[in-house]
């Protein structure tokens, strides 16, 4: 474990490393960050990793946290002329990776933004300006020239619903954003010392990936259909190169153990809405500690059939309060109605406030399930101040 002397503050720093042919990692090193969302205390800071691939065309994979804005943009412009950027690949839209998308669009107005359908929809609502876009599906490819043919892997719920992986056939690098990462900040670009990293690797899995074990297994199955993977370029922490087989094997083992649990709890939340996603992760992490499997689903993008299927296999339900008005209210309320219709009196239920001003009353939502005969798993969770 990297220890920081008491009272000593490390700066936000940048690191650029050529990790393969015409491929550069831009790593934003956040030495002192001690918390990542509510449930995720950090001992060793974190990094936000971004990548440039230069073929005949140039692609940038992910950006950085907005706290690195000027440092990151200065570093990027030292590597390339942003106006020459052809593609911006958004692995997912969580702000720590997409926080500078607007800045990239300002520097490179002709860039094409590449992402899943859900990611592009989210960016349209966030950016509020027209931009060139390319929606990709599983198995789609993008040829940058000079052998850099990118193949996209859809990996929803790792750990956001819009996640994609990107595989470069020439360098055999798989870019996975959050998956297979860890919150660990030091100057080593790669996973040179497994013993030093494995505690943080497991803790990261438990907090973020364990609640989505079945999604992990689905992603691993899709990864197995790719050619050889020599490096996994993660969004946080060191890149995996020396221990790719070992560490992906651990993900498989842990996820299979989690998926075999006899009891499943379904956790329904709303991404980018109040504290819904953060609280749902904290609750899900706590549930997995008891040996119970968790399946998480985002009400913003939930398909009614998928909602029904998940409710039908779950012994317990946890739901964050949805909005009663606004852009996503209708879809979220439809999902809630589907949950209510599919739920049965043998199930337990818990509800929590999302912390947004326009959200439904937590008591009103709880009463709807109580009227159906479901047993409260815990008292409604109220938010009286910013969760920490």
Model-assigned labels for residue ranges:
Residues 16-78, 165-168, 172-175, 276:
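Conserved beta-strand hairpin/beta-sheet module of binuclear metal-dependent hydrolase folds
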Residues 52, 165-203, 209-231, 241-269:
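Metal-dependent phosphodiesterase/nuclease catalytic metal-binding core
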Residues 61-63, 85-93, 113-116, 174-177, ...:
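Active-site neighborhood of phospho(di)ester-bond hydrolases with catalytic His/Asp-centered motifs
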Residues 7, 11, 17-21, 115-163, ...:
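Metallo-beta-lactamase
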